[in-house]
């Protein structure tokens, strides 16, 4: 999916209205999408509760199910207008609705004022929020859904104390929250929290998804993201460029019937140290399970028997002391993965630098391979062949990456542009950044993957897809997606607490089969 900035959305809305679509019409459609989502959320809550009530108490003849309740928090701008319209629609659908504005933040735009009038004409009321009022608190706690329509994509400055009190009321209620366009308090372009932000269970975003819904704290606070078509013609954004996107995997290419192992990619993996022998094995299995034809595990001689004893399909080989021989062996591969379980020995670090300086093949750097180039960034800048780095935040900082502003997306893009490398910044919503300014945000994966060895599997998968000849702009984000999807399949079967990287490995073929 293409992810939009606040400026782009402002321009797209302007074009739509200049093209003859009234702002009130857009607002009405946005509100309808919000009301539909509120109904769905209420059904999800009420169904198990109603079933339990009936099983225990039964339903007296003629008695109706309890009326559904919503508390709608409206801000001063057009996001608030969406809220007023949503409140009216829910009221007309039989909900008990109370709508609130924050002291000093009455509706200011013409469209928001009109929607507030329409709500009142329909029998609704607009009240001033008093977050410490026991009656308001009691109503809030009794609701099926809280609707956040305080601020939308235009927010640029931290929330003031009045708005923070409203946000705190929503977050502390324990009631499902539905956000209009973006959770209030989230910066649209970065996902940063501006003073405080709503913890939404679901966000209905309009026309196009926004960057801040998928990166930074916004990726956590947005909950499930639903994109609503509110009637803005595609022509209003077809000339726009969207360098930031979520990963859309597409279909895998069909393999020719006469293909053989040498044509399916040769992956060379350098790693393994005492106490870290599992890392290259996991990387090798990740490469094989994602389609590599041949995998070589080059490990120090003293751990060779351990690694060789754990390999069936991969070929283990002991490293010699001559860097030229290691280089010659690596040159026979399609791609090299340097670092899984490599350890911190200076000899191994020098070997990594030697390969980077002389190997004319794509290189994936992970784990201790990344630590080896810390302080030697010029080696990366000097490479002519493709280089992919796969750090987590700690490794990224050791490489010189700047996360001080808390904007992982911008930090990843800056580093990729500076070094000429593809950067896979691992973590929640892994970011794959390219030197030309494009970035892909991954939405697959789950907390069960937060265990040692998962990153080794990913490194093997990235190397595998590159070795099979997929173009880098597809291979790298696709590997990240498949890694997360395999983790999701493992979690569905085993749960998030007990799954291991080898469980993830077993699910890679199933994740890939979904794309065949």
Which ranges hold each PLM region?
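Small-residue (G/A/S/T)-rich helix-start motifs and N-terminal tracts that mark the onset
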Residues: 1-102, 109, 202, 213-363, ...
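N-terminal small/polar loop signature for handling phosphorylated ligands or for N-terminal nucleophile
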Residues: 65, 87-171, 305-317, 324-332
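Short, solvent-exposed loop/turn segments at secondary-structure boundaries
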Residues: 111, 158-159, 191-192, 400-404
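Short acidic loop-to-helix transition motifs that present clustered carboxylates
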Residues: 131-134, 184-188, 211, 322-323, ...
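Internal gly/pro-rich beta-alpha loop/helix module
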Residues: 144-145, 150-240
């Amino acid at each position: 999916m293409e992810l939009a900035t606040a400026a782009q959305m402002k321009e797209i809305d302007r074009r739509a209205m200049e093209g003859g679509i009234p702002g009130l019409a857009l607002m009405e459609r946005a509100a309808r999408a919000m009301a539909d989502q509120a109904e769905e959320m209420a059904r999800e809550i009420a169904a198990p509760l109603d079933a339990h009530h009936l099983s225990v108490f039964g339903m007296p003849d003629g008695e109706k199910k309890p009326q559904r309740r919503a508390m709608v928090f409206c801000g001063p701008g057009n996001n608030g207008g969406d809220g007023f319209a949503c409140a009216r629609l829910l009221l007309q659908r039989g909900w008990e609705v109370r709508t609130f504005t924050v002291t000093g933040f009455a509706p200011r735009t013409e469209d928001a004022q009109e929607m507030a009038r329409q709500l009142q004409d329909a029998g609704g009321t607009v009240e001033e929020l008093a977050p410490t009022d026991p009656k308001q608190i009691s109503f809030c706690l009794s609701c099926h859904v809280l609707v956040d329509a305080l601020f939308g994509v235009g927010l640029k400055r931290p929330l003031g104390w009045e708005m923070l009190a409203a946000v705190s009321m929503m977050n502390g209620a324990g009631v499902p929250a539905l956000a209009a366009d973006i959770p209030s308090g989230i910066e649209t372009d970065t996902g940063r929290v501006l003073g405080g932000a709503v913890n939404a269970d679901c966000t209905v975003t309009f026309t196009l998804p926004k960057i801040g819904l998928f990166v930074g704290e916004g990726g956590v606070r947005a909950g499930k993201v639903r994109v609503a078509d509110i009637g803005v013609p595609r022509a209003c954004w077809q000339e726009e460029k969207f360098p930031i996107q979520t990963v859309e995997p597409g279909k895998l290419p069909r393999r020719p019937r006469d293909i053989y192992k040498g044509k399916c990619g040769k992956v060379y993996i350098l790693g393994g140290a005492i106490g870290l022998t599992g890392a290259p094995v996991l990387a090798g299995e990740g490469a094989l399970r994602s389609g590599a034809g041949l995998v070589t595990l080059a490990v120090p001689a003293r751990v060779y028997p351990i690694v060789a004893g754990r390999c069936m399909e991969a070929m283990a080989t002991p490293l010699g002391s001559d860097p030229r021989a290691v280089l010659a062996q690596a040159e026979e591969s399609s791609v090299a993965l340097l670092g899984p379980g490599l350890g911190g020995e200076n000899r191994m670090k020098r070997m990594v630098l030697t390969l980077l300086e002389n190997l004319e093949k794509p290189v994936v750097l992970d784990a201790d391979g990344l630590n080896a180039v810390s302080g030697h960034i010029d080696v990366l800048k000097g490479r002519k062949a493709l280089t992919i780095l796969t750090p987590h935040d700690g490794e990224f900082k050791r490489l010189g990456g700047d996360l001080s502003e808390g904007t992982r997306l911008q930090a990843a893009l800056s580093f990729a542009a500076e070094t000429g490398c593809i950067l896979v910044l691992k973590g929640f919503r892994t970011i794959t950044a390219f030197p030309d300014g494009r970035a892909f945000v991954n939405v697959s994966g789950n907390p069960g993957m937060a265990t040692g060895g998962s990153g080794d599997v990913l490194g093997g998968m990235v190397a595998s897809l590159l070795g099979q000849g997929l173009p880098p702009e597809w291979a790298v984000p696709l590997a990240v997606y498949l890694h997360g999807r395999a983790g999701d399949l493992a979690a569905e079967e085993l749960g998030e607490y007990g799954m291991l990287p080898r469980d993830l490995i077993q699910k890679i073929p199933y994740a890939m089969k979904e794309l065949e």
